Amino acid sequence: EAQLNLIMAQKIESKLKALGANVIMTRTGDTYLSLEGRNVVTRNADPDIFVSVHRNSATSSTAKGYENFYFYPFSIPLAKNVFDSVGATGHLTMRSVKYYPYYVTRVTECPSILTENGFVSTASEYEKLITDASNETLAQATVEGIVKYFNSIQ
């Protein structure tokens, strides 16, 4: 999962930088950074938004789809814009935008979301998620959602 997340995050980073964004990554290689370490990087960067990229897992072998999570209500517009952009691709089953007190969204003072880009525990979805085309589709949709969010607040 960590490698898939990094691949997708790097695609998002590249696309956002191509649009002129200043992007700070909490990790750029196959290294582990504690939750507190991620928080330190984020606070020092003082970002406009925070997006945490993940893949989901479940005990059910049939669980599938995309969902994202927020903590503070001011993060809902970001969550919904990204959710809608991913949904527009038709690439994954769409679950929902949900409130949940994940550490990274709870301690971040800017609009922040944690994305769950499919279930690696479901064989059919895993086979899709490991492809470059899937990572490209999800990264592009995430970027489009971020752009829509910023356009909506100007």
State what each model feature region is:
Residues 2-154:
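Active-site-proximal helix/loop segments of hydrolytic enzymes
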